[in-house]
Amino acid sequence: MTSTPAEAKITVMAVHAHPDDETLWTGLALAKARRLGHDVAVVTCTLGEEGEVIGEKYQALVDAQQYEQGTGMLGGYRIAELQRALGALGVQHGPNFLGGCGTWRDSGMEGSESIRHPRAFAREVEPAQDLLDAQVEQLIQQIQSIRPEVILTYAADGGYGHPDHKQAHRIVHEAVQRLSGASAEGAGADVFVPSQVLWCVTEDEKFAKGMQGLEDDPTAVPEGWTLPAAGEIATVPSAEVDLVIHGSAEDVAAKQAAMRAHATQIWVADGTASDVNAQVRESNPPAPSATTLFCLSNLITQPLLDSESYRLGWTAPGVPEDFFARALAEQMV
């Protein structure tokens, strides 16, 4: 018995700020869509140059401002990680970088020196509209080339406030509005307009269930890792979630493999080591909804869930709100 999509084939495109975001935020949706025969693509806006590096071996990849022996080669290294992650998720197109590889740079966090870099994706510049216009036109070109019915990106707050995440949200919605307006005005029969935009979010109840039992069993937390303090992981109330995508064991395994591919950024406690990080951590999370545990460079424990949560960001006129849900519905044959 095999699963097939209940609806016609579509193209799903995720627009993300940095390499690894496509996996952490939307990896399950992309893997499931591909398994069901849909086309999937990812547009990455920067190379993630400001990321911290897990493990000792490749600390010198970061900039000299972060590490005395820093070489500033992290962005290039993360291209290779992104390639492997996309392969694990089944993404056929890419890597695709907004405006081309290296056009835009990781801005870092609010108030950092890096956000004033001339190529910073969310650069603090006047007039800000000029920067936005350039990025929107580049994204429109990608949309017209890839022709996605569904676009996945962040909510207006970027998920946790990162300037690049918020900028990705802005350009997605501005691009869709411009395309929708051009189509309505009859600017050209060849103008492709997506059907739906969804925002990836971390749902509070799902996250809490994935962490269930860890406080009562300290041995379940990998050595050297910590549990998140209250509010340390940004979540949204379950009442605000419009779509929950449940992944099969195959989908979750694909996301987990993609997470391992981003070894400089993600540490998966699944008993495996890598060239980047020789240290091994194992986990046996008590919660049934958590496949394994992982952390970023901050060593804060998080669960790899068997689902992802989304909010509706925009739906084209005449398109049902459950458009993407229908596309991911499975029928057994």
Swiss-Prot record:
Annotated positions binding Zn(2+): H18, D21, H165
Pfam families: PIG-L
Any GO BP annotation: mycothiol biosynthetic process
Lineage top rank: taxon: Bacteria
EC code(s) of this entry: 3.5.1.103
Coiled-coil region: none
UniProt cross-references to NCBIfam families, sorted A to Z: mycothiol_MshB
Protein name: 1D-myo-inositol 2-acetamido-2-deoxy-alpha-D-glucopyranoside deacetylase
Protein source organism: Corynebacterium jeikeium (strain K411)
Gene name tied to this protein: mshB
